[in-house]
Every structure is written in structure tokens, then in C-alpha cells.
Amino acid sequence: MFQNLQGTFEKEIGKIIPFTIAFKRAEAVEPDGCVQSWRCCLPCDLGQASRFIHTTVCSAIRWRSCKGERNFAERHILPAELEEQSNHAGMGPILPAMPSVDGNHFQHPAGDCHPYGILCLQAHSASVTARQVLQ
């Protein structure tokens, strides 16, 4: 299942750049199905990618909520908190905070920048985290 979002981004120089963000639904990784990842395909330009993270995070959560997904925003996080965290996006890549069990993924707080422009979202236990996927 894919969900495409389109819009524009205005750089500091005043140039308006169109973009498309595609969300791909992944399989649940928890037995109760609570944690589900959405792979977000951001623009290839790494300079733009970090500035789209806040849009990606908020849009993904909002879309899941209106579609009635099992693990959606109302159950896991306050919208205001997500918005506050996402406002810190665009400040440059942040080093991985903690490797996951398989050693190939790194979890970041919601809104952190992804250096490669690929972001996976997970919602679980009253938190939303951005997961960095190394390729």
C-alpha cells in the first residue's frame, strides 16, 4: 500500500521546489501488531531531505489516523508533542542513538534528520520514533 503526498518547499533563496513523499506500509514487527513501519521516500537531494522530515512525520501520523490504522496518533502521542519535536528538523544529521536488535537499524527521536533521505516511522508505547535504515 502506498500513499503519495505532493507539495512544494521554498528554499532560503526563494526558489519553490515541488516534491513527492511516498509512504509504503511495512509488516508489523510486534506480536500485537502495534508497531508498524512506513517507509518514506524523500527527495534525492540530501540538502532538501533533512528539511522535509517534519512534514513527513506529521503527515504520516495524520494519514494513519484518518485511515483508522490500529496504531495511530491518538493512542500513542500528543500531536503538540510531535509538532514540537518535528520543529527541530532541518538542523543536519544526528548520529544514531541506539542500534536495534538486528544491528542494521538505528532509532532516533521523532523529527531527527535522516542523512540519506529515507525515514521509517514507528509508533509504540506512547512514543513515535524515526528509524534510520542503512543501505
UniProtKB/Swiss-Prot annotation:
Taxonomic superkingdom: Eukaryota
Effect of residue 26 to T: In a colorectal cancer sample; somatic mutation
InterPro entries: DUF5541 (IPR041240)
Pfam families assigned: DUF5541 (PF17695)
Protein name as annotated: Uncharacterized protein C12orf76
Encoding gene per record: C12orf76
